[in-house]
């Protein structure tokens, strides 16, 4: 779909969606996203121009279907996949990608740290119609062997190679400054971000400033060349509710706002990454603070998890916090799986995490009156009341699971037209009884049509 669009713009010096938007141009990607979001294309262009919405769409990811992330759009979901040094490979990660897309992930991040990282990423991008994000520091360390060997030249080389491959957004841990290290010492759990912990190690060993911060202008040049969006990473996100909203977290958030403004001057799209573990009563204020400090750049949050004791069920704790975050202004939720804090998720865990967070995002969209959200709920109500079982499966966020559960007790096709399920049976079904009452009332009063 994008090949012809990109061909028409191949000679443009700054091919970013933000550049076009600032110059009054509504790109094909903007028109597509506006149609999907049921909004005016000119309004969307203005949002992109002002940094309030991003359309992550690397010019080298030609089979990508455009999507947008921003507070005025429906809340989006990201799925994390990726190999580790002890588990998974190319086929497994492509399978996780396909599961992610099937169950509704709007973007997917490849967080691979083991195996042939370039081949894994190549196959993921090749098979993906959604934007792919990465955390470049993982490959940088993988390639140089240890954090001590990291150089800015190697860092920039890896970042550009990933941009050439077609990565649509980078998580860059540029907001964690050397001066924040004393704030970390006051925490119960220190640094829980992998990228953040690596940056801390490098800064302490070299007694120098964060290299991502130092080379930020060069990173922006690469991003502008390929239209790679930046996801400014929260290295100091709280890893437990005790550390939530502390000086370390807020100090970094202020720097992320400064970096976002620098990126906008170079026509690079930006979203801000957020917490983390946050008590439920602090989630809304965290969302509002980001809007103030980061000029309403899209907020991309991990959870937040409002409790620390949900091990094995953290997709639920995260979805609870994510609902409040989305309602309070978050633009995208990073899913959490049941394996969070316990191990590398498999395809089944990916499915569970995505659906839980699709539910959270949808609840917020309905509450906020986002266009096209509540209509699906109304259609489901009609299907339920009319015993249209196949329609109910189709409208569910996880159609396969809905059908599986129904068919556990009533698998025969004849029961797809039955006016009851196995919960109440034919005599005690409230819907059926209610329909009869309604029918009889209409006949008695002769007022119904």
UniProtKB/Swiss-Prot annotation:
HAMAP family: ThiC. Belongs to the ThiC family. Zn(2+) binds at residues 277, 341. Binds 1 [4Fe-4S] cluster per subunit. The cluster is coordinated with 3 cysteines and an exchangeable S-adenosyl-L-methionine. It catalyses: 5-amino-1-(5-phospho-beta-D-ribosyl)imidazole + S-adenosyl-L-methionine = 4-amino-2-methyl-5-(phosphooxymethyl)pyrimidine + CO + 5'-deoxyadenosine + formate + L-methionine + 3 H(+). GO terms for molecular function: 4 iron, 4 sulfur cluster binding; carbon-carbon lyase activity; zinc ion binding. It is an enzyme of class 4 (lyase). Substrate binds at residues 80, 109, 138, 173, 193-195, 234-237, 273, 300. This is Phosphomethylpyrimidine synthase. Keywords: 4Fe-4S, Iron, Iron-sulfur, Lyase, Metal-binding, S-adenosyl-L-methionine, Thiamine biosynthesis, Zinc. Homodimer. [4Fe-4S] cluster binds at residues 421, 424, 429. Catalyzes the synthesis of the hydroxymethylpyrimidine phosphate (HMP-P) moiety of thiamine from aminoimidazole ribotide (AIR) in a radical S-adenosyl-L-methionine (SAM)-dependent reaction. InterPro entries: ThiC (IPR037509), ThiC/Bza_core_dom (IPR038521), ThiC/BzaA/B (IPR002817). Its cofactor is [4Fe-4S] cluster. GO terms for biological process: thiamine biosynthetic process; thiamine diphosphate biosynthetic process. Its EC number is 4.1.99.17. It comes from Campylobacter hominis (strain ATCC BAA-381 / DSM 21671 / CCUG 45161 / LMG 19568 / NCTC 13146 / CH001A). Pathway: Cofactor biosynthesis; thiamine diphosphate biosynthesis.
